[in-house]
């Protein structure tokens, strides 16, 4: 029989009052077990009319301040976030039979943070941020490839490619974080952390 924590859950849930510590533990385990992109997450956003959309992005930073990803600010997701900052993230690690769902609000990171991450990227990725008008219609693939070549000529010094003003990061400040573990016969285990008005986290067990 699996060992249980004080709430009767599998020992992998630990006994932590801070969800960020539990996230860090699960994330480290995912990086060892998950074959591809353990930092991949489904990001759900909605426009001002409430029409939702979802796509996969990569987590590029996390702390008790939130969870960070980067994108073109003029993309569909970028425009939706400007209209409606409420969003959700979902990590699903098949190798661990675990999932983490996060709900919160998005805020753009500061320029220094965006610059530091942008400058850490490969040259071709930095050029791509200039060349791609993300989510806009292309008349042909060659249109994009030509733009890439033109920006490579413009920024031929690989150590000096400035960050486009339309490219930055978003930080999701969570209000709830739910941890999920697959169980036999669909009797899954769910632990939800909710942020109260005093800034403290409370834990709740949820029915599967």
Predicted features and spans:
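Binding-site signature for planar aromatic cofactors or substrates
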Residues: 1-208
């Amino acid at each position: 029989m699996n060992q249980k924590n004080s709430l009767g859950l599998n020992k992998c849930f630990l006994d932590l009052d801070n969800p960020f510590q539990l996230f860090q533990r699960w994330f480290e385990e995912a990086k060892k077990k998950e074959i591809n992109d353990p930092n991949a997450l489904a990001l759900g956003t909605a426009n001002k009319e409430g029409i939702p959309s979802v796509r996969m992005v990569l987590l590029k930073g996390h702390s008790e301040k939130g969870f960070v990803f980067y994108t073109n600010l003029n993309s569909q997701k970028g425009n939706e976030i400007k209209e409606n900052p409420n969003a959700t993230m979902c990590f699903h690690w098949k190798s661990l039979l675990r999932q983490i769902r996060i709900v919160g609000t998005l805020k753009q990171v500061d320029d220094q943070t965006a610059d530091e991450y942008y400058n850490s990227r490969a040259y071709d990725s930095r050029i791509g941020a200039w060349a791609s008008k993300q989510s806009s219609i292309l008349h042909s693939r060659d249109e994009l490839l030509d733009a890439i070549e033109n920006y490579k000529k413009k920024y031929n010094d690989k150590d000096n490619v400035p960050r486009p003003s339309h490219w930055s990061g978003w930080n999701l400040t969570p209000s709830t974080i739910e941890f999920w573990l697959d169980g036999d016969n669909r009797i899954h285990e769910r632990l939800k952390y909710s942020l109260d008005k005093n800034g403290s986290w409370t834990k709740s067990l949820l029915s599967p």
